[in-house]
Amino acid sequence: MAIIYLILLFTAVRGDQICIGYHANNSTEKVDTILERNVTVTHAKDILEKTHNGKLCKLNGIPPLELGDCSIAGWLLGNPECDRLLSVPEWSYIMEKENPRYSLCYPGSFNDYEELKHLLSSVKHFEKVKILPKDRWTQHTTTGGSWACAVSGKPSFFRNMVWLTRKGSNYPVAKGSYNNTSGEQMLIIWGVHHPNDEAEQRALYQNVGTYVSVATSTLYKRSIPEIAARPKVNGLGRRMEFSWTLLDMWDTINFESTGNLVAPEYGFKISKRGSSGIMKTEGTLENCETKCQTPLGAINTTLPFHNVHPLTIGECPKYVKSEKLVLATGLRNVPQIESRGLFGAIAGFIEGGWQGMVDGWYGYHHSNDQGSGYAADKESTQKAFNGITNKVNSVIEKMNTQFEAVGKEFSNLEKRLENLNKKMEDGFLDVWTYNAELLVLMENERTLDFHDSNVKNLYDKVRMQLRDNVKELGNGCFEFYHKCDNECMDSVKNGTYDYPKYEEESKLNRNEIKGVKLSSMGVYQILAIYATVAGSLSLAIMMAGISFWMCSNGSLQCRICI
């Protein structure tokens, strides 16, 4: 009877409770931190784009310049097989095949060709301007051509150039000049012809020992043709050597030659600058649009990093070599074990989160005579959400000094420089990747610590309100020493709990509970004595009964001596 009394007594003593906890869900998202790997979190954001669409697209609505089977040189010089490129609109980038078929139809070389290609990475449109019309060279023949550049079975030549040869038996000094009044810089290309032998030199130019000089305010170049036998290319042993310069606004370029000059008929006014580039690709333009293009395909993403290809054009994420960059945005995901109950050993923020709280990251669970329920703490959740929302922007801001990997090209004579450049770019990308990965690890560590701190702050905020009107249960929960209805619970949650209002009731109940504990110890002692005495009496009675039975049937003889 006493045991039943005690059970009822302790059941009656248990009071209303409120617990501080955090959100949990069924997420399997994992992140890495400085100290841990594969930490399961409630929410995470992958910030590394790994995919592309495999297509070459318009960039911001502007199509690329698709060279097809022509090279950059073939386009600018005017290879007859590239006539469709004689007039081109604005481009977003340039598509060039790895080994284009039509380049220099007349065999030769293009000085500083790689630098010219690099120049094109900042140009989005050339306006072709006639600078030295063909009919101005009245003392020279301007119809020179070659079977190497044949079109429709007839000899031809580069469309944008004029090959000056002798007229009759004379080749007077050829002079020409152009003053750049276009308002923009102008690309100007010229050439020098190198014959196969002296007989060819005289047949074309009459003169031997000729020169070609080109001069601007910043350039003076004098070339002497090199007469020599060479292996045949495209059926020719002779060569043409092309050079280029940028003519500044209001500057003048002067040409003078006693023979072997390939003069420009057209120059290229740089009418629009901007971020461009040359995509080495065998693909063709497709009906699609993008804001970021790589040689492998377009990237359409809002993520801050990608690992598709180091060469990009447009509004692109930062390139890194990483395989994984995931930012934690939520909390450690440690769902409570439902079978053990809310107020069991796993309750609160110490041992598990609440899947039942879905409208916030941190909050409360209360239990009283009116029932129980979850409620998120909107203020702390909103502050945390605002901080996490800015995290990706913070990462981007910290990494805003992106190293731009430019696809530079080098001639065969500069392979050592090319190898050195590649090693430098690889080194930069390695460092850049390491910085990005380290930043993500550090941010993840800070995020998880930030959430832990927010839960602790919420717990401390409640504890400071309730003070000694409650008992801390040690698992994130408080047990009230007074009755706390739903209105009382709401006041705790919104920070308006009236401590003095419940102080006396809590004090009385706190003392009563202490008295119950003391009296319960006395009851336990009485029960122990009672059990001992009762057990001894029962044993004595049982022994006496057995002895009496044995004496009555002769199994035991009893002698009484006086």
Curated annotation (Swiss-Prot):
Organism annotation: Influenza A virus (strain A/Korea/426/1968 H2N2)
Regions of this protein lying in the Cytoplasmic compartment: 547-562
Function summary: Binds to sialic acid-containing receptors on the cell surface, bringing about the attachment of the virus particle to the cell. This attachment induces virion internalization either through clathrin-dependent endocytosis or through clathrin- and caveolin-independent pathway. Plays a major role in the determination of host range restriction and virulence. Class I viral fusion protein. Responsible for penetration of the virus into the cell cytoplasm by mediating the fusion of the membrane of the endocytosed virus particle with the endosomal membrane.
Pfam family, one: Hemagglutinin
GO annotation (BP), single: viral budding from plasma membrane
Protein name as it appears in the record: Hemagglutinin
Extracellular-side positions: 16-525
GO cellular component: host cell plasma membrane; membrane; viral envelope; virion membrane
Signal peptide boundaries: 1-15
Subcellular location: Virion membrane; Host apical cell membrane
One term of GO molecular function: host cell surface receptor binding
Site label Cleavage, positions: R340, G341
Primary localization class, coarse: virion
Glycosylation sites noted in the Swiss-Prot or TrEMBL record: N25, N26, N38, N179, N180, N300, N494
Assembly mode: Homotrimer of disulfide-linked HA1-HA2.
Keyword terms, alphabetized: Clathrin- and caveolin-independent endocytosis of virus by host, Clathrin-mediated endocytosis of virus by host, Disulfide bond, Fusion of virus membrane with host endosomal membrane, Fusion of virus membrane with host membrane, Glycoprotein, Hemagglutinin, Host cell membrane, Host membrane, Host-virus interaction, Lipoprotein, Membrane, Palmitate, Signal, Transmembrane, Transmembrane helix, Viral attachment to host cell, Viral envelope protein, Viral penetration into host cytoplasm, Virion, Virus endocytosis by host, Virus entry into host cell
Disulphide-bridged cysteine pairs: C19-C477, C57-C288, C70-C82, C105-C149, C292-C316, C484-C488
Organism phylogeny: Viruses, Riboviria, Orthornavirae, Negarnaviricota, Polyploviricotina
Family of this protein: Belongs to the influenza viruses hemagglutinin family.
